[in-house]
């Protein structure tokens, strides 16, 4: 069924297809017929970051940037949903076209640029959701905010979403906001992590509950970079790390018509790089800091591979676009076998 729907959607421009698909999900959910086309996975509970997840397969940030579709997506069987990336102020993102399919590689190149409606819009949607599963909210900085002032945007984001999130992700790894990835390294990272923990502590005191904070990193790191990030996360006392975001490498798609398009490459070509980063992080972190693995999950084996590499949870996005909801069940069952 999904294969037929995907073939129809793939006749549309990628961003248009994205919006049509999510709108159709909303309609099906409101009509109460969504479960007719999907099968809920059997429970596979895990406890990570002090949170109980019904299963370890979540939806990665980026699909539902504004939290417009939480209820429909939450009905598909995900163990958790992550919305965003949201910035303090609404921004249009980069000029179109800014998303490109590479079906031969089960991949997508995007240079969206944190297009979103801002914190107020997202929070309104989150407050009115019916979905009561685990919800992560991914926060970023506005494009016009200089890196030296970026901590102000992250503080605003954390403070605003704190009352509504089960966990918060700080995105410092999108390749589509100029200079953003510079925040992953050196004193910039250490200073940002310090500010994040300060804001988290202030919010905990204000709201009387502890909301874990994770940082999302890029796959384009060498061993030295991975060791530095791991040490900085431990030193600051972060609660988790999401590995990884999209890659700027085109090695795996050389010769493709879209090879030279600027932006982040996601999907199957990121699988190997993501696993290497997870392995490197786990070698440094062990079980002291949980890893959420994302990047290149297109079937059960690639999901279980992330767990073998050291991840406690996984997230899907591009694979979900190519495979549909059946990927959720397949990934859950593969991970169940891996951890049993």
From Swiss-Prot:
Instruction: Identify a single GO molecular function assigned to this protein.
Output: dihydroorotate dehydrogenase (quinone) activity
Question: Which CDD domains does the record associate with it?
Answer: DHOD_2_like
Instruction: Keyword check for Ion transport, yes or no.
Output: no
Q: Which UniProt keywords apply?
A: Cell membrane, Flavoprotein, FMN, Membrane, Oxidoreductase, Pyrimidine biosynthesis
Respond yes or no to whether keyword Mitochondrion is given for this record.
no
- The active site consists of 174 (nucleophile)
In terms of Pfam families, this protein maps to: DHO_dh (PF01180)
For this protein, the parts annotated as crossing the membrane are: none
The compartments listed are: Cell membrane
Enzyme Commission numbers on file: 1.3.5.2
Q: Give, as in the UniProt entry, the pathway in which the protein acts.
A: Pyrimidine metabolism; UMP biosynthesis via de novo pathway; orotate from (S)-dihydroorotate (quinone route): step 1/1
Free-text remark on how the cofactor is bound? Binds 1 FMN per subunit.
This protein's cofactor list reads: FMN
Classify the protein's membrane topology as the record does: Peripheral membrane protein
What InterPro entries does the entry give? Aldolase_TIM (IPR013785), DHO_dehydrogenase (IPR050074), Dihydroorotate_DH_1_2 (IPR012135), Dihydroorotate_DH_2 (IPR005719), Dihydroorotate_DH_cat (IPR005720), Dihydroorotate_DH_CS (IPR001295)
- Please give the Gene3D superfamilies that the UniProt record associates with this protein: Aldolase class I
Q: Which GO terms describe its biological process?
A: 'de novo' pyrimidine nucleobase biosynthetic process; 'de novo' UMP biosynthetic process
User: Catalysed reaction(s)?
Assistant: (S)-dihydroorotate + a quinone = orotate + a quinol
What family is this? Belongs to the dihydroorotate dehydrogenase family. Type 2 subfamily.
Could you give the subunit structure recorded for this chain? Monomer.
Known function: Catalyzes the conversion of dihydroorotate to orotate with quinone as electron acceptor.
HAMAP family cross-referenced by the UniProt entry: DHO_dh_type2
UniProt protein name: Dihydroorotate dehydrogenase (quinone)
Q: Which organism is it from?
A: Marinobacter nauticus (strain ATCC 700491 / DSM 11845 / VT8) (Marinobacter aquaeolei)
